[in-house]
Every structure is written in C-alpha cells, then in structure tokens.
A protein has these predicted regions:
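Ankyrin repeat boundary/linker residues
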Residues: 35, 68-69, 102, 135, ...
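Solenoidal tandem-repeat scaffolds enriched in leucines and small polar residues
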Residues: 127-153, 159-164, 168-177, 201, ...
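Ankyrin repeat A-helix N-terminal signature
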Residues: 11-16, 44-50, 78-84, 111-117, ...
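Start-of-repeat signature of ankyrin repeats
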Residues: 5, 38, 71-72, 105, ...
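Ankyrin repeat structural motif
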Residues: 17-25, 50-58, 84-92, 117-125, ...
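Ankyrin-repeat-protein effector appendages
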Residues: 1-11, 155-177, 181-192, 198-199, ...
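N-terminal segments that cap or nucleate solenoid repeat domains
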Residues: 1-40, 44, 181-195
Length: 457
C-alpha cells in the first residue's frame, strides 16, 4: 500500500511540480508506488510531457517498464501514443523495452503507427522495434498503417525488414482498401503486378471486382496486363462491364484491353454489359469496336439478350450499331421474343431496323398471328404497314383474322379489315372461317363487323 509520501509524489508528478517531486524523493517516497488507478509517478510524468520529472524519476530508480494495469500500458507506449519524442528518447536511452506489449498484444510501434506518428515509428525502429510483431488479432504495424492510409509509415515499414508473408498480406489489404499511393510503394519495391495475391486473384482482377478505380489506374500505369483473366476466363473488362463500372471500362479500353475476349461460356464484355442493362458501357464497348453479333455458347447475341430483358435503349443502340435483327436462337428471333413479352416499343425498333415481319414461331404461327391473338392492334398495324402477310396460314390452316376473331380481339379485327387485303372467307383445316369462329365463341361485335365487310359462312 502506498504511504502518504508516495501519494504526494504521484500527485506532484501528475501536476508537473518538479521541486516537489525532488523533495519527496529525497525524503524517501517510493518511486515505483502506484495510486488507486494503478498508475505510477513515471506514467503520470510521461502523460503530462514533463521531461525533467521523467529524468529525475529515472535517477531515483523508477522502473521504466512498469505498466499500468489492467491495460498493460507502459511508459514507452504512452510516450509513443502521445507523440512525446523527447521523452521516448529518454526512455529508450534508459533501456526501456521497445517490444513490450499491452494486454491486447500491441507494442509501441503499432500504437505509433495507428496514430500516424512517422517520426515516433522511426525512433522505435531505430531502437530495435520488431516490425513483424502481431497483436492478438493478428494485426501488424504494416496492416495498421494501411488501414489508416499512412503512406509514409508504410514506406518506412517496408524498408525495415518486413517478412514476405506479412508483405503479401499487406499487399492484399492495400488492394482491398483501394490505397493507390500505398500500392505504388509496393510496386516501387518490386511487387509482381500479375502474380496471384493470397486471395488467388491477380491484383488487377481484385481491384476491378471492388470497383477501385484509383487502384486500377495505378496498376495499369505500372504495366499490369489489361487482358489478364480469372480461371473462368473472365477478363478485367468483362468484370467491369458486368458490374457497371463505366470509368474502369473506359480506362481498360484506353490501356489496350481486348474488347472481344470470351469467357468459358463464350460471353464477351458486350454480352455481360448487356445482361446487366448498362447502357453507357454497351455504348463504350461498341465505340471500341465490339462485335455486335457475337454468339455465346448458348447461341445468344447481345440483341437477343437485351430483347428478352426488355432493355429498350440498349436494343436501339445495338441495332444502330449493326445488330442483325433476324438471327435465330432455338427458332426464336428477337422480334418473336419481344412480342411474347409484349415489349411493343422493342418490336417497333426491330421492325424499323429490318426485322422480318413474317417471322414464324416454332409452332407455325407468324408474328402477325401472335400480335392478333394478343389484341396488340398497334403492332398489327405496324406489321401490316411494312409488309406482313395478312393471309399467311399456320400449320392448322388458320389466318391472322381467324385468330383475332376466335379470341374476340375486336380492335385487331378492325385493323385487319381496314387493310383491305384480308381473305374474309378463308377456311382452316377444320373448315371454319373467321366468321364461324367468332360466332362459335359468341363474339357478336366481331360477327357484325365481319358480316358488314362481306364475310359469309
């Protein structure tokens, strides 16, 4: 237990009262006594930045490694944390343990690093601080410096004997954290640009996946291969296109990334940008010369994909850049797919750019028939205007008029009749006319309309 003299000594050190400290020490106060906070006079003197008091306490035998419990904070750690470089030098000169750790396993070097005190870190390293120490969480001074983005300290640590495992861990952390300036420090010290990181991915792929533009730029400027790919054949450009990282796409293209490389599924960056609906990226890839009609291993072109997804603006852009509107996939064309999904505007774009208005579905029905069945009178009119055959028959011998009449599509029947070329009395293989089908299904308005136009049974 501390005596009254001891308590007075601790108080004097805390207050920075040099004369009082000297007097109490001369009277026999215990230099290593602690108060109710488990704190010594030396720790209070360090905390207050009282250099002269630190010096006199040392002369009277203060234990320079005695730490405050339960935190385990030593005078040296406290000096580092408070950026007291002169006191730190005093303690080091007196033989303080520069590698002593607190209850978390943290040494003074990591504390100084966390605070961003480059000069303090350098003092500690010069005094023998071990650069490769880990705390209880496995962190090192280098990982702390990267997490805090202290480039100057990172450079200092890299030049102080960091072992290869820690260097590789830190490289990966800098990539994940998007630290371009710090990445450059590694690169300047010979870190391979295209070798896999500890994650198994190459630096450029990793940076692109995370959308870290600054890191991507640093890597490319340093000479990273812009066409490097994953095991699945995904290039950096494909990944950026799929994720919608427009600026990264532009940067990769400017640095020579191949626009038509394919992954294991035969997809290009244009396929992937289209799938995700990234119009600006699709435009950038097309401007860079991407092959607009490339098929993946499933037979899909970007136009087929955009059509199925209902991406109107992308469909139009692809068509403007030469996408073929009549390429088929399992018997389907972009137009048949658009009509199935009732994407009327896309149907119009496709027709305007040369889609076959007489395209036939696998079931034998024409696009016009499908439009009639769905009572899409606007599309029916467009199809007729550009030459769709209004009298073409399907496998059952049914015409567009029959299908419209059968389903009760009054508006569509009107459009067909307005065209003036419809065979009113055509019979299907069952011997039924459009009029008979309308009567059978009790569509009286259509029956009247057909009869007025001259239809007979």
């Amino acid at each position: 237990m501390a005596s009254n003299w001891d308590i007075l000594l601790i108080q004097a050190a805390r207050q920075g009262n040099l004369a009082r400290v000297q007097a109490l020490l001369s009277q026999g106060a215990n230099v290593n006594a602690t108060d109710g906070q488990n704190t010594t006079a030396l720790i209070y003197a360090v905390q207050g930045g009282h250099r002269e008091i630190v010096a006199i306490l040392r002369e009277f035998g203060a234990d320079i490694n005695k730490s405050k419990q339960p935190q385990g904070l030593s005078p040296l750690m406290l000096a580092a944390a408070l950026n007291h470089s002169e006191i730190l030098a005093q303690l080091i000169a007196a033989g303080a343990n520069v590698n002593q750790v607190n209850q978390d396993g943290t040494p003074a070097l990591m504390i100084a690093t966390y605070k961003g005190y480059t000069a303090i870190a350098e003092q500690l390293l010069t005094a023998g601080a071990r650069v490769n120490m880990r705390d209880r969480d496995g962190d090192t001074a280098l990982s702390v410096a990267i997490s805090q983005n202290y480039a100057a300290i990172v450079g200092l640590l890299l030049d102080s004997g960091v072992d290869e495992e820690i260097r590789q861990e830190a490289w990966l952390e800098a990539l994940n954290a998007n630290r371009p300036e710090i990445l450059q420090l590694f690169i300047n010290r010979g870190m391979p640009l295209d070798a896999p990181t500890l994650s198994g991915e190459t630096p450029l792929i990793l940076a692109v996946e995370r959308g870290n533009l600054g890191s991507v730029q640093t890597l490319l400027q340093a000479g990273a291969n812009p066409n490097i790919s994953t095991e699945e054949g995904e290039t950096a450009l494909m990944l950026a296109a799929a994720e919608g990282y427009f600026d990264i796409v532009r940067l990769l293209l400017a640095q020579g990334a191949s626009v038509d490389n394919q992954n294991q599924a035969g997809e290009t960056a244009l396929h992937l940008g289209t799938i995700e609906g990234h119009l600006e990226i699709v435009q950038a890839l097309l401007q860079a010369g991407a092959f607009v009609n490339h098929r993946n291993h499933f037979g899909d072109t970007p136009l087929l994909i955009a059509t199925v997804q209902g991406y109107e603006a992308i469909v139009l852009e692809l068509l403007k850049q030469g996408a073929e509107p009549n390429l088929t996939q399992q018997g389907e064309t972009p137009l048949t797919l658009a009509l199935q999904r009732q994407f009327t505007k896309i149907c119009r774009y496709l027709l305007d750019y040369g889609a076959n208005p007489n395209a036939v579905y696998p079931d034998g029905k024409t696009v016009l028939m499908k439009a009639c069945e769905g009572n899409n009178s606007q599309l029916v009119r467009w199809l007729i205007d550009i030459g769709a055959d209004v009298n073409k028959l399907d496998f059952s011998g049914a015409s567009p008029l029959m299908w419209a009449s059968y389903h009760g599509c009054l508006d569509t029947v009107k459009v067909l009749l307005d065209g003036g070329k419809v065979n009113l009395n055509q019979k299907n293989q069952g011997g039924m006319t459009a009029l008979m089908l309308a009567k059978f299904n009790h569509h009286q308005a259509i029956v009247s309309l057909l009869q007025q136009a001259g239809a007979i049974e």
